[in-house]
UniProtKB/Swiss-Prot annotation:
This is Pyrroloquinoline-quinone synthase. Pathway: Cofactor biosynthesis; pyrroloquinoline quinone biosynthesis. GO terms for molecular function: pyrroloquinoline-quinone synthase activity. Gene3D superfamilies: Heme oxygenase-like. SUPFAM superfamilies: Heme oxygenase-like. PANTHER family: 4-AMINOBENZOATE SYNTHASE, PQQC-LIKE PROTEIN. It comes from Pseudomonas aeruginosa (strain ATCC 15692 / DSM 22644 / CIP 104116 / JCM 14847 / LMG 12228 / 1C / PRS 101 / PAO1). One of its GO terms (biological process) is pyrroloquinoline quinone biosynthetic process.
Amino acid sequence: MSRAAMDRAEFERALRDKGRYYHIHHPFHVAMYEGRASREQIQGWVANRFYYQVNIPLKDAAILANCPDREVRREWIQRILDHDGAPGEAGGIEAWLRLAEAVGLEREQVLSEERVLPGVRFAVDAYVNFARRASWQEAASSSLTELFAPQIHQSRLDSWPRHYPWIEAAGYEYFRSRLAQARRDVEHGLRITLEHYRTREAQERMLDILQFKLDVLWSMLDAMSMAYELERPPYHTVTRERVWHRGLAS
């Protein structure tokens, strides 16, 4: 006998309860928040997270391409503009590059993606490929880790200037801008999710989709922990060179 569907309030509570697995609790992020991260670890995180940032518009474009609802598209497209930039606005990707410069990285090196670890690349690529293959509703719902994003952005704004005075203040603009953007995006994504998943089976699938996205974010930090905390980057027993691939054209 199938279980009854959760009502909207119960379903939303179940979604929010997934926050216990958000990457704000990963030891690598905790170390950054508590001021225990080295300059090299901060730089490694910024360089690798850039790959996630530049792929978010591709994920959102896949959702738009699969969505026949014009009203949804008109609202969702703002996410692409937030990252790529609208006319006269730099956008989030440019803001991230300024963060990279603020922590002492060369813009060209970050853009080259030469420091992106294979584990990070695999995790991000899995997310983008999911958005391309899934229904637009499922892909849109996978973005609901944004439920927990304002807290993580605020934690960086609260702790990093105190612990890492060597980071130039101009680099924090990305985190400031995402505070409002993430809250707006949550409202839209949550509305789509609560309206679309009406059966218990569908709701359980959505919770698993959200767990998949949480797995993506956690796995990225696992790869960075291996490379920058344990000092075991890929092929460390063979070479100290970055011999790993930098993305293959499809």
